[in-house]
Each structure stands twice: as structure tokens, then as C-alpha cells.
Amino acid sequence: MSSSLPLHPLLDNGISQGKPNFPGGKLYCHCASNKVEITLTSDVLHNHACGCSKCWKPKGSIFSVVGVVPTSALSVTANASKLAIIDKNAPIQRYACKECGVHLYGRIEVEHPFKGLDFVHVELSEGGGKEGWQGVQFAGFVSSLIGQGLDPELVPGVRERLKSLGLENYDALSPPLMDAIATWNAKRDGVVFRSSL
């Protein structure tokens, strides 16, 4: 059964690895007209499949695919008045179209290791995320699928599918991102780093 679950369109049909020095592009909501338009002036980094309950997922998919760009590389270039924050209490302020519900970007305004990075979904571009954007690098928050109703017995099969696609999968973020979070927290707390224990 898990082999037939739709993971995400950028995973189910094979992973595109993108183009070096991809310059970015435009992302759009799903409205038929007067679309919200986001312009990105860089490629994404840390593009990954996310199983958390907060990220926007295409209809029928159990994962989102989300990457980050520097906040300075993102601008709303059309129909900004259609955007609203989904949950003002969440660390990531997810801006969604009030009409179609698609999340266009997430921004962190509070002190946080990822402040200065915006979270985006490259499949919202005209090429569906395959025209040059960084490919999916790993899968995070896989166990979170259970809390959203996925039968726990299916999760091992989901993990096997992810591995067959060449994706390591975690129940948090990838080790380099977890190290970045720990480093940020340690610096904030005044920890002095030493070269040996």
C-alpha cells in the first residue's frame, strides 16, 4: 500500500536535481486569475520533503517540498493584498492566498536560528519545480505523518520509498541543519567552543 501513496509530485515522478547557478524565478498561487506572484532572485537551499503538519502540501500528497532563500531574495510582485498569515503565533509566519489557500512563503520575524531565511515551495513555479530549482535533498519529520492520520504500519514503506529515491529521512531536519540550530543556540547562550573535549 505505501508504494502507491502519493508522496509529492516532485518525488513520485523522479527527482530532478536542478541546474548549477539557477537564478530563481516566479511562484504563483492557484487562483485562476489575479494570482499572487512571488519573485525569487536566487535558487533555494536545503530543499526537502517535509512531513510536518504545518507546511502546505499539494492536494493528495503526504509531504510538502520546501526550501529556503535569503529574505532579501524574495519579493511579492503581484496581488500582495490577497495574502494573509495562517497562524500569527507560529515561529514561521506562513503567508497564504486568502482565496485559494496556497502557502506562498513563510518568514520568521522572531529570534530564531533560521531568521533571515524564507521558506518556499518551488512547485508553485510555472515548470512545477522541475525547471532548474535545487532538487529534493532529504526528507524531514517523517514520523509526523502518523499524527496526521497515516497508519503507522505504512511508515516503514514510506521510508523505503524515500531511500529508493536516494533521500535520507529523518524525524527532525538533516544533521547539518540540526547542527546549525545547535550552533546558533550555543552562540546565543555564550558557549565558548573548544577544539577537543
Swiss-Prot record:
InterPro entries: CENP-V/GFA (IPR006913), Formald_GSH (IPR014185), Mss4-like_sf (IPR011057)
Catalytic activity: S-(hydroxymethyl)glutathione = glutathione + formaldehyde
One annotated GO biological process: formaldehyde catabolic process
Residue span, CENP-V/GFA domain: 22-171
EC number per UniProt: 4.4.1.22
Any Pfam family the entry gives: GFA
Gene3D superfamilies (UniProt xref): glutathione-dependent formaldehyde- activating enzyme (gfa) (3.90.1590.10)
MF terms (GO), sorted A to Z: S-(hydroxymethyl)glutathione synthase activity; zinc ion binding
Pathway the protein contributes to: One-carbon metabolism; formaldehyde degradation; formate from formaldehyde (glutathione route): step 1/3
Cofactor: record remark: Binds 2 Zn(2+) ions per subunit.
Cofactor(s) named in the record: Zn(2+)
Residues engaged in binding Zn(2+) 1: C29, C31, C97, C100
UniProt entry keywords in alphabetical sequence: Lyase, Metal-binding, Zinc
Binding site for Zn(2+) 2: C50, C52, C55
UniProt cross-references to HAMAP family, sorted A to Z: Formald_GSH
NCBIfam families: formald_GSH, PRK05417.1
Biological function: Catalyzes the condensation of formaldehyde and glutathione to S-hydroxymethylglutathione.
Family as reported in the entry's similarity comment: Belongs to the Gfa family.
Protein name: Putative glutathione-dependent formaldehyde-activating enzyme
